[in-house]
Amino acid sequence: MTLKLYSFGPGANSLKPLATLYEKGLEFEQVFVDPSKFEQHSDWFKKINPRGQVPALWHDGKVVTESTVICEYLEDVFPESGNSLRPADPFKRAEMRVWTKWVDEYFCWCVSTIGWAFGIKAIAQKMSDEEFEEHINKNVPIPEQQLKWRRARNGFPQEMLDEEFRKVGVSVARLEETLSKQDYLVDTGYSLADICNFAIANGLQRPGGFFGDYVNQEKTPGLCAWLDRINARPAIKEMFEKSKREDLLKRQNEKVA
């Protein structure tokens, strides 16, 4: 049995299957795809996922894409390994999937758009105008992604950013409403609902960040306690610590090369 996860590391959508692999205690090879080098658009990676997007899971010659789908796949294939991440009760499992659907269709998108506007801009501006257009037209297969790259380079409309910040506020309020009453998003315990939402919410609480006014101990104590609770889990701590070591080793090897 061979598992390889191609990802950007422990953040955003890449964190979902990465955390799931650690929670399940599965052996796997982590393959870092470097967005600063546009590796997700490279020919070698598009042989793995023709859409040029991470994460992607390689399992004995078969490739599974889409972050939440990968998480469910790992639970389906390895139900007895490590921690169970889906409620046994069908109704509670449905509740879990309402949360994973919501994060994929709403919460992730508003946070992602703001991340693209402010975090991806420097990467998108590394090339000349001519080089950028050639790269986007030749190597980015999805029209919607082409548009996002152009907006990241040239600037997102302010009214769009205002709307996405509004949606972040709505998202944070929904999470706080639930997490002020219970430890996890589904009251039967920790599940993929938590992993998938944690992947997007973790970091929003950083003081001085874009979202510090939305997520803090005063305004969202339940959400902050939930973030602390998940960050304290042994599997999550191992994920972050091992990823830091691998990143440091990679940087050292690049300096030697």
UniProtKB/Swiss-Prot annotation:
Sequence ranges assigned to domain GST N-terminal in this UniProt record: 1-82
BP GO terms, sorted: lignin catabolic process
Keyword Manganese: no
Database matches in Pfam families: GST_C, GST_N
InterPro entries named among the record's database cross-references: Glutathione-S-Trfase_C-like, Glutathione-S-Trfase_C_sf, Glutathione_S-Trfase, Glutathione_S-Trfase_N, GST_C, Thioredoxin-like_sf
Residue span(s) of domain GST C-terminal: 89-257
Keywords linked to the UniProt accession: Lignin degradation
Gene3D superfamilies: 1.20.1050.10, Glutaredoxin (3.40.30.10)
PANTHER family per record: GLUTATHIONE S-TRANSFERASE GSTA (PTHR44051:SF8), GLUTATHIONE S-TRANSFERASE-RELATED (PTHR44051)
Family of this protein: Belongs to the GST superfamily.
Function: Lignin degradation enzyme.
Name used for this protein in its record: Protein LigF
Species assigned in the record: Sphingobium sp. (strain NBRC 103272 / SYK-6)
Lineage: Bacteria, Pseudomonadati, Pseudomonadota, Alphaproteobacteria, Sphingomonadales
